[in-house]
Amino acid sequence: MSIRHCVAVDLGASSGRVMLASYQPGPRALTLREIHRFTNSLQKVDGFDCWDVDSLEGEIRRGLEKVCEQGILIDSIGIDTWGVDYVLLDKQGQRVGLPISYRDDRTQGLLRHAEAQLGRAEIYRRSGIQFLPFNTLYQLRALVEQQPELVSQAAHALLIPDYFSFRLTGNLNWEYTNATTTQLVNINSDSWDETLLNWTGAPLAWFGKPTHPGNVIGHWICPQGNRIPVVAVASHDTASAVIASPLADRHAAYLSSGTWSLMGFESLTPYTCDAALQANITNEGGAEGRYRVLKNIMGLWLLQRVLKEQNVSDLQGLIARTAALPACRFIIDCNDDRFINPASMSAEIQAACRDAGQPVPESDAELARCIFDSLALLYARVLNELAALRGHPFSQLHIVGGGCQNTLLNQLCADACGIVVVAGPIEASTLGNIGIQLMTLDELANVDEFRQVVRGNAALTTFTPNPDSEIARFVAQFQPQQTKELCA
């Protein structure tokens, strides 16, 4: 059997990669190779925080061309990115307006406005999605209110991965897993909810019916003239990461750890009860009709900002210095919206500790210790919420994504949660992207079969909880009322 070559374009909030996967069907050997890496950052344009999508497109094309230059025949391409953000196109397929980021503050106050007009429970009943102030629901309302001239110019609204697929193929697509992050998809019909869309003021005609992962959107013509299928993978990066999570059984939870931390479990049915609403649980779409019942946690965004502000280049050295410090001296609520995009993350963390009457972290190691301890405690709280929601404790927690390389945080998580943690794979989003491509190419039957491939090829590390650790002893004192729901 011939080797399959699939390319995953994986875009994150701070960087992007073009990765080549080679799959040998016989031994089920799967290898990944990074072909091209590039930075991604926000730019101020006309007062808005925007993505440089032209630069990103150029980097994507350069990465694909690098693969072709090596004489490799690509079987398929897939693109995954972050959620909620969109690009407007006119009837000719030209971009309209700016590709504004979810971290821009233009949606301030609109979540409360929606709750007042539609009702919080009604919005949740329709969408099943967590209330976040930057959801596309509120972004579109901000667009209509603040830039009404763009509404008549636009003919289509594409989420970020669908936009880049369009740029490669010329074909429009609205992929389901990412569409659900908008808070605009009806959880019962898997189509756009007209009541919610009407509230935004955006035309329903901007959107086509969401399609589930696994369809071929179109073809990219490589410089050598080959027509390469572009597959609609699970284009929300977390959806792809969950596909690649080697969950042991239905009682295993996952934590996709990166800029954001997404903690949850898979379910064949959504959870939209009052308890789920009160806990601000989200029911995002997954592959094969599964729901990703999860909660957004601010994640390593706080650390990324601190590293930049403190000019730290040696992360492993910082982690070693952090591990030597006592635990739980500085505790913040990582899900406080004050940490979404402050002018200085270091100063904001210090201010939060000062406001709480705690000692104030001064050094880079103390700031990191504050972040790690606070995240681990929040992970424990969320895991308990999820277990209570489903009425059954979890057997394991699988940490996947780039954050799973942080061994200190992995152990703190195991200790705080009192559960065995299995870390890996690191490249979860990329692997999940590749998994859907291999299923589309009929090399694998389903997600469960792909997870067997992941288990057979990925390096996994187990962390056993230590009930005598400082953070484990502190957990009993950790008061839930000290935290509030992220942007709820």
Swiss-Prot record:
Keywords on record:
ATP-binding, Disulfide bond, Kinase, Nucleotide-binding, Rhamnose metabolism, Transferase
- One Pfam family name is FGGY_N
Question: GO biological process: any one?
Answer: glycerol metabolic process
- Name the CDD domains for this protein: ASKHA_NBD_FGGY_RhaB-like
Q: Which spans of this chain does the record mark as coiled coil? A: none
Pathway recorded for this protein? Carbohydrate degradation; L-rhamnose degradation; glycerone phosphate from L-rhamnose: step 2/3
**Which cofactor does the UniProt annotation name?**
Mg(2+)
Domain of life according to the entry:
Bacteria
The active site lies at D237 (proton acceptor)
EC supergroup of this enzyme: transferase
Q: Name one GO cellular component term.
A: cytosol
Query: Member of which family?
Result: Belongs to the rhamnulokinase family.
Described by its record, this protein's role is as follows: Involved in the catabolism of L-rhamnose (6-deoxy-L-mannose). Catalyzes the transfer of the gamma-phosphate group from ATP to the 1-hydroxyl group of L-rhamnulose to yield L-rhamnulose 1-phosphate.
Q: What is the designated name of this protein?
A: Rhamnulokinase
- Report which gene this protein is encoded by: rhaB
